[in-house]
Every structure is written in structure tokens, then in C-alpha cells.
């Protein structure tokens, strides 16, 4: 299996989370898994080359990204119904509820994505980061000293929380600035049908890919939308520079 490294990374994260919560506070294992799953969702969305190599293709990274996002919602809903309001401050509970409402709303928007403009959908999708921050406030306000004193649990939760925050910050504020190392020029543009275009691009340096994978392209020419869009890749003339 070519994506074994990526799958081992996901499985190891969940196993470590389960073992840590089971040995310290087993009653909070569900929200603990939700936090790890959310952090993994942000990490997978960074499109880092390392992750792409681990999963053997960006399309496989996004398949797992969708899985962890869906799993996060299921865990959060289950947590909300099974433990909501049992303990903790009113403000902490409000942060948690607000985070869940935002997550669910964005999931609904995702299903309506094909009916709204991509740029609008992309900005709405970024609200997930705000919900994640609300969720972290909820967790740390609820757990108190358990997560503020150094131990295995606080190290695990803090590590994944920090990775999730850094990943989200990178996606929203840094991705379009420091990414896109491959420059190219469009050499041919062909309309295949009413909603499909074939674009041939000559790159400034070789780019290894396989037919059927996809990549994000950004158009720098003035007058065009600057947001990166995903495009399917075809092995045109079996060249890696076009």
C-alpha cells in the first residue's frame, strides 16, 4: 500500500489519544478524540509536500481530510448530547455550543458548495478555524488544571492543539504567500464542454505527477481571480514540465 506512512500517522494519532485519555480521564475520551481529529483535519489541509508523499498523492490526502472532518462532527455531536451541561462554567459551555453550531453550518455549506461561487465558499470554509479556537477555549476552560499542569495528557492535548492552530494559521494567512514554487505559462486553452476547460501549461522546472492526480493552480495575471483552484492533471505527452 503506497499510502501506508500516511495511514500509520493517522492511526498512531488516534491510538495514542485513546491510550492517553483511557489512562487519565476515560470519561472524556470522546471529546479528546474529537480534538485530535480536528487537529488532523487542519494538518491534512495544509497540502504539505511531506503529507503528499506519505499518502502518495494530494487526492488521497483530501480523502482522509474529509474522513477526519466528518468523524470530528460525529464525535462532537455525540459529545454534546452525552455530556452537554453536566459540568463546567456557563461560558465554557457556550464556547462549546458555538463551535459545534459553526461546524455543522459549514458542513451544510459544503454540500451547497457547487451552488455558490468558489471564492465565497472558500471564505466561509475558513470559519472552521474560528470554531476550532472556540473549541479549544471550551476544552481548556472545562478541564482546568488537568491540561495546565505538565503531564502526558496536557502534553498530548497541547501538542495537537498547537499543531492544529499553526496549520490553520498557515492555511489562511501564509499558504498563498510562501507556496506555489512552480511558475508556468499557459500554452493552450481548450473548451471541452460547458463546464470543463483543458489547460496546457509549460512549467519553468520539472514537476513530477501521475495522471488523475490534482494540483492547485493560481493565476497571477491581473483581472483574474487570485484564489488557487484545484485542477485535475493529465499526463499530456508524458512530460513532467507541461
Task: Provide a role label for each language-model segment.
Residues 2-168, 183:
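Membrane-embedded alpha-helical bundles of multi-pass integral membrane proteins
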Residues 167-179:
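Short boundary/loop segments of OB/S1/cold-shock single-stranded nucleic-acid-binding domains
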Residues 178-242:
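Ferredoxin-reductase
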Amino acid at each position: 500500500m503506497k499510502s501506508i506512512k500516511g495511514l500509520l500517522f493517522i492511526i498512531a494519532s488516534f491510538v495514542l489519544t485513546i491510550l492517553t485519555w483511557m489512562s487519565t480521564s476515560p470519561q472524556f475520551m470522546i471529546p479528546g478524540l474529537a480534538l485530535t481529529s480536528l487537529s488532523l483535519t487542519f494538518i491534512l489541509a495544509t497540502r504539505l509536500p511531506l503529507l503528499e508523499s506519505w499518502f502518495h498523492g494530494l487526492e488521497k490526502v483530501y480523502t482522509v481530510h474529509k474522513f477526519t472532518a466528518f468523524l470530528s462532527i460525529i464525535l462532537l455531536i455525540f459529545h454534546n448530547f452525552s455530556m452537554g451541561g453536566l459540568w463546567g462554567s456557563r461560558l465554557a459551555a457556550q464556547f462549546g455550543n458555538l463551535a459545534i453550531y459553526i461546524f455543522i453550518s459549514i458542513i451544510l455549506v459544503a454540500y451547497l458548495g457547487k451552488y455558490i461561487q468558489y471564492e465565497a465558499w472558500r471564505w466561509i470554509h475558513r470559519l472552521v478555524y474560528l470554531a476550532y479556537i472556540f473549541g479549544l477555549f471550551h476544552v481548556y476552560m472545562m478541564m482546568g488544571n488537568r491540561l495546565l499542569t505538565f503531564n502526558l495528557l496536557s502534553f498530548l492535548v497541547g501538542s495537537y492543539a498547537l499543531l492544529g492552530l499553526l496549520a490553520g494559521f498557515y492555511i489562511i494567512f501564509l499558504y498563498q504567500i510562501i507556496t506555489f514554487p512552480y511558475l508556468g505559462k499557459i500554452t493552450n486553452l481548450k473548451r471541452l464542454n460547458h463546464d470543463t476547460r483543458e489547460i496546457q501549461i509549460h512549467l519553468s522546472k520539472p514537476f513530477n505527477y501521475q495522471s488523475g492526480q490534482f494540483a492547485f493552480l493560481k493565476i497571477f495575471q491581473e483581472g483574474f481571480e487570485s484564489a488557487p483552484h484545484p485542477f485535475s492533471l493529465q499526463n499530456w505527452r508524458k512530460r513532467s514540465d507541461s
